[in-house]
UniProtKB/Swiss-Prot annotation:
NCBIfam families: PRK05255.1-1. This is Dual-action ribosomal maturation protein DarP. CDD domains: YjgA-like. One of its GO terms (cellular component) is cytosol. The keyword rRNA-binding applies. One of its GO terms (biological process) is assembly of large subunit precursor of preribosome. The keyword Membrane does not apply.
Length: 179
């Protein structure tokens, strides 16, 4: 006995439950993700122990990274692959977030130093106008000390002497910024 086309549907089980969504991932995408995790592992290998302390790593991963930092040549590559494999089985987001914070803090510090250098240059070139701006930014700054350092820096610049006072101004501004 042959079934009619409309009877074929009777053999299909009713699936009233929600169908599980199957997400198809290409092999190339899996490889790209694995390569990205290896790069993350390489970035972690470049960090010092103080920086690694600030990143949430479990003991196995931490010891694998420390071992990779000691290994040279071909063994290092294999260890990097192991670190990538270990990262695939862990949640990478907290690690990436902590790593980005470390990088961002360094960038912020560099930007602050550039700002302080420009402020120092303005102090030496413009004198009292720039001193007023510095005092507005940092009310706890000592006007007399700052003006004395500026005068010394201007004398050194005019006499082609080493910029000792110039560096002192920068150090003073840095102390004010960190306070």
């Amino acid at each position: 006995m042959t079934k009619q086309p409309d009877e074929w549907l009777d053999d299909v089980p009713d699936n009233d439950e929600e169908d599980e969504e199957i997400i198809w991932v290409s092999k190339s995408e899996i490889k790209r993700d694995a390569e990205e995790l290896k790069r993350l592992g390489a970035e972690l290998m470049e960090l010092g122990s103080n920086s690694l302390d600030r990143i949430p790593l479990d003991e196995d991963l931490r010891s694998a990274i420390e071992l990779a930092q000691k290994i040279k040549k071909e063994g290092r590559r294999r260890q990097m692959q192991l670190i990538g494999k270990m990262l695939r089985s862990r949640d990478e987001e907290p690690i990436r977030t902590a790593l980005d914070k470390l990088k961002n803090r360094h960038n912020q510090q560099v930007a602050l130093f550039h700002k302080l250098e420009m402020m120092r240059d303005r102090l030496v070139e413009q004198g009292d106008e720039a001193v007023a701006e510095v005092l507005a930014l940092y009310p706890n700054a000592d006007r007399q000390q700052l003006r004395a350092m500026i005068r010394n820096a201007q004398k050194e610049k005019a006499g082609n002497k080493p910029p000792k006072a110039y560096r002192q101004i920068f150090q003073y501004l840095r102390e004010l910024a960190e306070a």
